[in-house]
Amino acid sequence: MKKGNGQLVLRACRGEAEYPALVDIWRSAVRATHDFLDGSDFTRIESRLASDYFPAVTLTVAEKDGKPVGFAGVHGASLEMLFVSDAVRGQGIGTALLSEVIAHQGVSKVDVNEQNHGAYGFYVSRGFVRVGRSELDADSRPYPTLHMELSTNR
């Protein structure tokens, strides 16, 4: 992993003991950016993060001043999750995580909730293009999803 951006360190997740901190980051980020998410879906997803979602991906953690502040989860060529604590949003942490997983894990795909305009713009500005749309998300919930791939013309 790499160090850069001052005191930002990108590293592999240290295992299950770190999951509670990652759930806190997820909660902060989702509350700030996913106002379209139904409360019961929020609770259900949150309850499955440590048991189902985190173990299914390779997690990269962004740490600032010794504290986790963001993370990315990758499966194959797909970025399955990227969340940054709302307290440090806009400081380049998401960009650093995305650059790391593209360069070192071969990420070339991401799915984005259609209602999450900020995330869509983030990925477009970093070279991703929309290649498809699904009416339901991966868990068959009524959250339309945009399928994006890294453009070869970056």
Which residues are covered by each model-predicted region?
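A short beta-loop-alpha structural element at the N-terminal edge
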Residues: 8-24
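A short helix-loop-beta-strand connector motif used in the catalytic cores of GNAT acetyltransferases and
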Residues: 50-61, 78
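Conserved beta-hairpin
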Residues: 58-70
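Conserved acetyl-CoA-binding loop-helix of GNAT-fold acetyltransferases
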Residues: 90-103, 120-121, 125
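A short, internal acetyl-CoA/4′-phosphopantetheine-binding micro-motif in the GNAT/acyltransferase core
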Residues: 78-89, 112-113
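Conserved GNAT acetyl-CoA-binding A-motif
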Residues: 103-115
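Conserved acetyl-CoA-binding loop of GNAT-fold acetyltransferases
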Residues: 124-133
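Conserved GNAT-fold acetyl-CoA-binding loop/helix
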Residues: 24-50
